[in-house]
UniProtKB/Swiss-Prot annotation:
Disulphides: 40-123, 212-217, 255-263, 280-304, 281-329, 297-302
Natural source organism: Vespula vulgaris (Yellow jacket)
Function: Catalyzes the hydrolysis of phosphatidylcholine with phospholipase A1 activity. Induces hemolytic activity. Acts as an allergen.
Active site positions, chain numbering: 173, 201, 265
InterPro entries: AB_hydrolase_fold, Allerg_PlipaseA1, Lipase, Lipase_N, TAG_lipase
Prosegment location in residue numbers: 28-36
Molecular function GO terms recorded: phospholipase A1 activity; phospholipase A2 activity
PANTHER family for the chain: LIPASE, LIPASE MEMBER H-A-LIKE PROTEIN
Name assigned to this protein: Phospholipase A1
Length: 336
């Protein structure tokens, strides 16, 4: 399983090198069409919704039309907080990292977790090897995925009386930008802003040179938290209210030499799950003071990565030291 993941991301990385160097040098990356055939199609029938609560962990598949069959959606109101999880290119909501992230959320704070499985539009089901040629299509599909998330959000707010303050989005790679487009759409619908969007190593190719309106942006939610773990598959640019650069945003400890970039890119999801599961937080030190020891951090200047980040007053870019194994924090995770 791990070898297949490594091979997938290696092929993706090789392709990105070619695309970035040859294809995306000029013009709007989102308008570039490498493939004009019906590959990686997006429509409401190609997206599955997986809903998890403490009472129901079956991970059954739903659509917009069948949501009302889930026990939670049979209620007149939904009172628990909601988290959307959105995967990235050639991935799915059924990959181990995303299952673990959903489980951590449900176990921690009794969230209702809604995982958006857009694997068809993310090119996951295309022919092996060739699927990586269709990345531009998947990148364009992120806007449609965002609109889909916004449609579910509208249902939650209008029919189930959930406050936008109780809805958070978490997206990895292309899923981070899809979350950003959802944030833009709900504002267009006059629903307000999501309480938070967490971008887990947002994808760099097709988005790095884009204006705020064409990618995940700080204005897409009340609070936008970005976790940077790679500098080629993921962007190095500051995008959020807070930007955490784990191990300086590249070459994550424990990822080895040969698959460092691809392993580092996926490590963002693992870090978030560990931050939720364990009290030991990964501590962000202001980049301007990155040489100072963690032991000297105060709650006024340093920030814990994860669900509690927005409780800290500091904003901006942060360096986060990490260890090579879970739970990855290199001390007891306390800020004085």
């Amino acid at each position: 399983m791990e070898e297949n993941m490594n091979l997938k991301y290696l092929l993706l990385f090789v392709y990105f090198v070619q695309v970035l160097n040859c294809c995306y040098g000029h013009g709007d990356p989102l308008s570039y069409e490498l493939d004009r055939g019906p590959k990686c199609p997006f429509n409401s029938d190609t997206v599955s919704i997986i809903i998890e609560t403490r009472e129901n962990r079956n991970r059954d598949l739903y659509t917009l039309q069948t949501l009302q069959n889930h026990p939670e959606f049979k209620k007149k109101t939904i009172t628990r907080p909601v988290v959307f999880i959105t995967h990235g290119f050639t991935s799915s909501a059924s990959e181990t990292n995303f299952i673990n992230l959903a489980k951590a959320l449900v176990d921690k704070d009794n969230y209702m977790v809604i995982s958006i499985d857009w694997q068809t539009a993310a090119c996951t089901n295309e022919a092996a090897g060739l699927k990586y040629l269709y990345y531009p299509t998947a990148a364009r599909n992120t806007r449609l995925v965002g609109q889909y998330i916004a449609t579910i959000t509208q249902k939650l707010v209008k029919h189930y009386k959930i406050s936008m303050a109780n809805i958070r989005l978490i997206g990895h790679s292309l899923g981070a930008h899809a979350s950003g487009f959802a944030g833009k759409k709900v504002q267009e619908l006059k629903l307000g802003k999501y309480s938070e969007i967490i971008g887990l190593d947002p994808a760099r190719p097709s988005f790095d040179s884009n204006h705020c309106s064409e990618r995940l942006c700080e204005t897409d939610a009340e609070y936008v938290q970005i976790i940077h773990t790679s500098n080629y598959l993921g962007t190095e640019k500051t995008l959020g209210t807070v930007d955490f650069y784990m191990n300086n945003g590249k070459n994550q400890p424990g990822c080895g030499r040969f698959f460092s970039e691809v392993c580092s890119h996926s490590r963002a999801v693992i870090y978030m799950a560990e931050c939720i599961k364990h009290e030991c937080c990964l501590i962000g030190i202001p980049k301007s003071k990155s040489s100072q020891p963690i032991s000297s951090c105060t709650k006024q200047e340093c920030v814990c990565v994860g669900l509690n980040a927005k409780k800290y007053p500091s904003r901006g870019s942060f360096y986060v030291p990490v260890e090579s194994t879970a739970p990855f924090c290199n001390n007891k995770g306390k800020i004085i």
